[in-house]
Structures are given as structure tokens and as C-alpha cells.
Regions:
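Conserved alpha/beta enzyme-core scaffold
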Residues: 1-323
Length: 323
């Protein structure tokens, strides 16, 4: 359950609007390196990750945050997956704001989350999936809250300081779902031009709202295309360049998670990872961090650990599923 007095600045819509309005809306180039992009993440920041569960997770950015040894972060994501487990096990995250945390139904609720929450090392603030989406939407709109029926009648009423309001038209009680204004957004997209105009294939999840609600927006892209390409299909540009602060080219930037149409999630890798946790508990995540995060110095070195054949197999699976 959430602490109603926890980080009230997250709900300060006037200050948050001021921060977003103060951002430079120039058409300058946003391309940079992973190291330079993640240097913008500070200890104590509230970091929101795009995608959903193991879909379009910004793994290259998460890995770089871990390599920067950031501390006392809050992580918010609609459905949290292995990226959350790695951040907790590394001591980077001390608070998680989510609707669910797992790799998927076959593996059940995260045992790593349970360990760190029950030990008191990590605070958990649980919202419904809809409520968390509304929080990002309210943040993107620059309003203090959005009314809804979600969570009413459940034990989640009051989580994170959520209050109820009376509908002025009918007198009915509504949930006043508070806006969420992250310090940093971590996002992964299919393609972007050098000015940060980002396109996403398939379901966009909550990324567009997160990008507009956050003070600082860091994006990795599978491909950098010309601005003529983004102008040719403007309807596909779900994140405008003026909200993006840093853009990094990162092929397979979600791996071992999926990126719709380009590569599938590596379920065999997930099975190996969870089997290790079943056998050795949180220590297995520490071993994983040493091998996949702290060991390989660059993103391409990380991908080399999986091998070209394994990456090609997941790309083939994605093509077969989206024919």
C-alpha cells in the first residue's frame, strides 16, 4: 500500500506544468550516446518506463541506469517486468509504482518484488492498470487529477494519497486519480528522426502520455530515419521531437523483451532466468547483473552475449507473427 504523504511534489501540477513549459521547443538534433543520455538521471529521481510488461521495454536505457549506479529511484510502469527486478536487486530502486509485476502469467507474481517489499527494502504503491494510465494522462494534460470509477470499493482506495470527489452533476462518488509527473521518462520506439520525432508500430501503450508528463525524456530507437520519412507518415509520430531531450540509436534496444514486428521476447531466456531465481533466490539476480549489466561495457557487447543466431531467431518469429 502507498504512503499518502509520499513525494507530494509528484502531484504538484502547477510546478510540473511550469517545468514542461520551460523546456526548449527547438528543432535541434537530439542524437547522443547512452552514457550521455542517462547522465541526466539523478539519484532520487522518479523514473517512468514506457512499454508494457515485456513489450518495448527500454532495456538499453535501464541497463545504462544500472551501470551509472543510481540510487533511491522510484520506478513507475503500468505492468513491470524483469527491468524492475534488476533495478531493485541492484539497490537502484527503493519504491515501485505499478499495477502488477511479473514476467507473465506462467511465472506468477514476481518473487523478487515479494522479497524486497517484505524485507522493507522497497516500498510498493499499487494502482489499478486503468488508474495508472489515467495518472499519466492527467500529467500529460497538465491537470491535477482525472475522475474515474476505478479502484472504488477496493482496498486500493487511498493508495498514494488518492482521494474521492463528488460528481457535481449526479452527486455520485468518484475516484480523483492524481496526475503523475515523472522526473524522467525512459522510452523505446521503432524509429525516430534526428530531431526526436518518434514513431511506434503496434500498440503505443502509455508512452505518449508519459513523454508529455515527464520533465526529462530519454528515448532509444531501433532505427534513425530521415525527417522526410517522419513527415511522410505524420500519423505515426506519437511522440513529438519537442518533448524529447535525448535520443539514442539502439538496435534490439528492448532485448530480451520484444519490440512489435521486429523481434519477439526471448522466452527461453526468461525460463533460464526464473529457474535460477527458483534455485538461488535474489542471489541469482545479482549474478545476472554481473554477467549482463556490469560485465559488457557497451550495448553491442551485451547483445553479443546472446549471439547473432538467437537474435535472428526472435526476429524471424516476429516476422512470422506479423505477416
Amino acid at each position: 500500500m502507498g504512503d499518502p504523504d509520499l513525494n507530494p511534489a509528484e502531484y504538484d501540477f502547477i510546478a510540473a506544468r511550469g517545468r514542461v513549459e520551460a523546456k526548449k521547443k527547438s528543432a535541434g538534433e537530439k542524437l547522443t550516446s547512452l552514457e550521455d543520455a542517462v547522465a541526466r538521471v539523478k539519484d532520487g529521481d522518479h523514473v517512468s518506463a514506457g512499454g508494457c510488461l515485456f513489450s518495448r521495454t527500454p532495456m538499453a536505457l535501464v541497463r545504462e541506469v544500472l551501470r551509472h549506479r543510481r540510487r533511491a529511484l522510484t520506478l513507475s510502469r503500468n505492468l513491470t517486468c524483469t527491468e524492475g527486478e534488476l533495478l531493485m536487486a541492484a539497490g537502484a530502486v527503493t519504491r515501485v509504482v505499478t499495477a502488477w509485476m511479473s514476467i507473465g502469467l506462467p511465472w506468477g507474481v514476481s518473487k523478487i518484488l515479494r522479497h524486497y517489499v517484505e524485507s522493507g527494502a522497497v516500498g510498493l504503491e499499487e494502482w489499478s492498470h486503468l488508474a495508472l494510465g489515467l495518472r499519466f494522462r492527467a500529467g500529460a494534460m497538465g491537470v491535477p487529477f482525472l475522475p474515474a470509477l476505478t479502484m472504488l470499493g477496493s482496498d486500493l482506495v487511498g493508495v498514494g494519497g488518492m482521494k474521492t470527489v463528488q460528481d457535481p452533476y449526479t452527486g455520485e462518488t468518484l475516484a480523483a486519480v492524481p496526475a503523475l509527473f515523472p522526473d524522467v521518462a525512459l522510452l523505446h520506439v521503432h524509429r525516430a528522426d534526428r530531431f526526436g520525432n518518434c514513431q511506434i508500430d503496434g500498440y503505443p501503450h502509455m508512452d505518449a502520455d508519459i513523454a508529455r508528463a515527464a520533465t526529462t525524456v530519454l528515448v532509444t530507437a531501433e532505427e534513425i530515419v530521415s525527417e522526410e520519412e517522419t513527415r511522410r507518415y505524420p500519423d505515426r509520430t506519437v511522440i513529438p521531437g519537442f518533448v524529447v531531450d535525448a535520443l539514442v540509436l539502439a538496435p534490439f534496444g528492448s532485448f530480451p523483451h520484444e519490440c512489435y514486428g521486429l523481434y519477439e521476447a526471448d522466452y527461453e531466456h526468461f525460463a533460464e532466468y526464473t529457474a535460477a531465481i527458483d534455485a538461488r533466490g535474489p542471489a541469482a539476480v545479482g549474478e545476472y547483473l554481473e554477467r549482463y549489466v556490469y560485465g559488457p561495457p557497451a550495448w553491442n557487447d551485451y547483445l553479443d552475449l546472446f549471439g547473432g543466431e538467437r537474435l535472428a531467431l526472435q526476429a524471424k518469429r516476429a516476422r512470422e507473427l506479423t505477416r
